[in-house]
Amino acid sequence: MEFVRALWLGLALALGPGSAGGHPQPCGVLARLGGSVRLGALLPRAPLARARARAALARAALAPRLPHNLSLELVVAAPPARDPASLTRGLCQALVPPGVAALLAFPEARPELLQLHFLAAATETPVLSLLRREARAPLGAPNPFHLQLHWASPLETLLDVLVAVLQAHAWEDVGLALCRTQDPGGLVALWTSRAGRPPQLVLDLSRRDTGDAGLRARLAPMAAPVGGEAPVPAAVLLGCDIARARRVLEAVPPGPHWLLGTPLPPKALPTAGLPPGLLALGEVARPPLEAAIHDIVQLVARALGSAAQVQPKRALLPAPVNCGDLQPAGPESPGRFLARFLANTSFQGRTGPVWVTGSSQVHMSRHFKVWSLRRDPRGAPAWATVGSWRDGQLDLEPGGASARPPPPQGAQVWPKLRVVTLLEHPFVFARDPDEDGQCPAGQLCLDPGTNDSATLDALFAALANGSAPRALRKCCYGYCIDLLERLAEDTPFDFELYLVGDGKYGALRDGRWTGLVGDLLAGRAHMAVTSFSINSARSQVVDFTSPFFSTSLGIMVRARDTASPIGAFMWPLHWSTWLGVFAALHLTALFLTVYEWRSPYGLTPRGRNRSTVFSYSSALNLCYAILFRRTVSSKTPKCPTGRLLMNLWAIFCLLVLSSYTANLAAVMVGDKTFEELSGIHDPKLHHPAQGFRFGTVWESSAEAYIKKSFPDMHAHMRRHSAPTTPRGVAMLTSDPPKLNAFIMDKSLLDYEVSIDADCKLLTVGKPFAIEGYGIGLPQNSPLTSNLSEFISRYKSSGFIDLLHDKWYKMVPCGKRVFAVTETLQMSIYHFAGLFVLLCLGLGSALLSSLGEHAFFRLALPRIRKGSRLQYWLHTSQKIHRALNTEPPEGSKEETAEAEPSGPEVEQQQQQQDQPTAPEGWKRARRAVDKERRVRFLLEPAVVVAPEADAEAEAAPREGPVWLCSYGRPPAARPTGAPQPGELQELERRIEVARERLRQALVRRGQLLAQLGDSARHRPRRLLQARAAPAEAPPHSGRPGSQE
């Protein structure tokens, strides 16, 4: 292995290059250069353009890789002015330093360009001019030292594009109209060299005209005489800006086809007032200026690298230039040597392919578009792309070379064809003309109602002289009329239009063809344009163009309105959504309760300690109120977490109910059911049931197909068919319907469905019998191939798609916007489920009331007797109060005997308004309220401090304080003479008060037993204070010690 490696190294040393590794001179040349090659630059004068060019040059100088790792150094020429003397001195100063290989300039005017042209030839220094303005005329003979790169469209390239467009249209004799041209003779000579033949007519429009009349007079030589042809078939307008070109084109006479030679962007192209068929061109996808600067620097660097491989000294060390003493530098100067390599350099740059022709013209990739002014499907003028030119190759769109000049005024050179059509929406519509008998839109057509040839000839003759009956005049428009107008413009031909007399497509009846086919065979019409299906039977007797519309047969049915079921109001949401909403409601209520009772700020006994608490029933009430937008009083959570969760639940309910409301109207209008048919092979069609009727249009392609393929079906449907498509649709939508299904071309059925305002029509089943619509012509007609070619071009160019979008772009059923006066009426049947739900709610309320009474009378006493389940605040405040505060129903049997004493009984029976209570009453009321709160909270500890009790005992007694029901102060004692029966009434009242006191004492014992002994003393002192005044009467009952 070591031997093999040594042998390989020896062969490499013996066969490899010498020790120099290149040219023997580079070492000395590099030492003199100092590691860089200089490139002079004459920058623009404008500050922004100057900064932009300097930045682009600085970036471009870093990109190229020169031989021997040399760099590119820029030497900027800065003349104080741009007059010839100052410009020459500035350029000469830039060429004085040694090593300046070439000069890069940005001339802004033609004098600068000429001065650079002469300076480059005098000094034999390569000068590369980057032209940023529009096309200019060439500078005479090519100068090998002055290379020009046009960033804008060069004149030579522009003329090449125009010549290619003229040759594509076979226009040989051309007229030129020149605007603002400094050298008309040079431009004409350049045109002759590019086109191969001189222009037939040249008009100089450089002089300004005072008005349109003078401009028309100067353009008159281009006009076509009356009844004759124009002197030239095409005219080119060159050198005009957009404003001047518009004035000229608005004044051009009829005759030639005009081409706008000024390149314009698409957005700057005008449309109004210009002649139809005008051709224009413009450069698209122009590379940025920085890319052009990069490529021109790259051109110099590549040429220097190639020259340095041959003669490094001559390529990299050019002699300094002395403009004051120009001496010849031998047979080939360094500048001429470098120019030779510049002229033979080509590469792929940032702008695309870059190459040099004629030793002075630098080319980069160009892309032009050719536009034609035509009319869109709506009749408005619009620019349409008809071709594309790239690097010398013109590619025309289908139909792009079909544009022909309009006929001159008064000339009748085009053939006039008689066209028959048939009303079939949306392909052909008809309406009455205006008051003047004219059609503001569409084409004037006749509705003769007959197929007699003599009658048709007489009617069209009367129409020509304006004496045709007004009742027979119609305005025809639609899909096929737009197609016919486009064909008449492009072919070209004139036409006169009429509606077929019998209103039929055509079928063989008794050995004769009817309808459209019959008119073509009889010679009454030269062309039939409508939704004319191509089938084998018709193709045997007439010719068809290539199909312009593809369709099939379809089946249309009508919807049947059915009554909404009881649960229709729940249809807007799926059952799983309803279940999820109510599950989320109860879960949210549970979390609201948990957060509120766990919070130190909640509405609970341990939180805010209010007289009300937030329980689970409160949470449910709140969640249901938010969900159904009820404006009822409900407790709200007080803790921040609960409020946040409550707001989130409100957002959830808002979105759910908004979706429900949005879908409610669409769902509750009633269900629509359709006749289910799978297609033409459905058993309902082949074996129709009693009362099932279906049909088609007489003598149509659909009837011919069914008659040929399904004779039995045709025998059944024959008596139910209709004369026209609209009549068949009317039979389907009548009430009661006369048809259950209608079979016809799917393109026609789809249009009927799209315009159905009631949304009752639908096409069902799979399409069958694929067919196409074509233009019918007599057999061996010379127009068949031409029209077929144009139709194919229209398909590929997108014109057919535009027609389809124009006439089929209808608002689909179910998505239309209703008018202000239109309403969706919903009957009582739509709300039957809601009424049933309300009745169920009333029944549920009755059951809930019975359950409430059962719980209060049966379950509550059992819970009260037990020692568990006594704390219900977190669930229901009412149940908790019933267990811990309210006396049970029927407790009279459990009470002990107790005698009521004092005037308390009399005070509780007062019904009249009472005076203001004294201060002692207020203190006692506050004490009772506090005692009630302690009992409500079920706290075993005494809430009143001992110090407060001592102070209360030590304070002077203000007299007895009586507490009456409803918080009212006691009434004044009666005075005066006794009344009859007053003693008996008082005794009765005393007995009632004694019974109530006995019940209160029993309840007090029960509470003390539940709360424990620690809470005995404070309530006892309070009750003793209340009962002290009542001990005075001798019959007042038991002493207070026996409580």
UniProtKB/Swiss-Prot annotation:
Location of region: Disordered: 882-924, 1012-1043
Entry keyword set: Calcium, Cell membrane, Disulfide bond, Glycoprotein, Ion channel, Ion transport, Ligand-gated ion channel, Magnesium, Membrane, Postsynaptic cell membrane, Receptor, Signal, Synapse, Transmembrane, Transmembrane helix, Transport
Secretion signal span: 1-22
Transmembrane segments: 575-594, 642-661, 833-848
A GO cellular-component term linked to this record: neurotransmitter receptor complex
Catalytic activity: Ca(2+)(in) = Ca(2+)(out); Na(+)(in) = Na(+)(out)
Pfam families found in the cross-reference section: Lig_chan (PF00060), Lig_chan-Glu_bd (PF10613)
Result after altering residue 641 to M: Found in a patient with autism spectrum disorder; uncertain significance
Similarity comment: Belongs to the glutamate-gated ion channel (TC 1.A.10.1) family. NR3B/GRIN3B subfamily.
Function: Component of a non-conventional N-methyl-D-aspartate (NMDA) receptors (NMDARs) that function as heterotetrameric, ligand-gated cation channels with low calcium permeability and low voltage-dependent block by Mg(2+). Forms glutamatergic receptor complexes with GluN1 and GluN2 subunits which are activated by glycine binding to the GluN1 and GluN3 subunits and L-glutamate binding to GluN2 subunits. Forms excitatory glycinergic receptor complexes with GluN1 alone which are activated by glycine binding to the GluN1 and GluN3 subunits.
Protein name: Glutamate receptor ionotropic, NMDA 3B
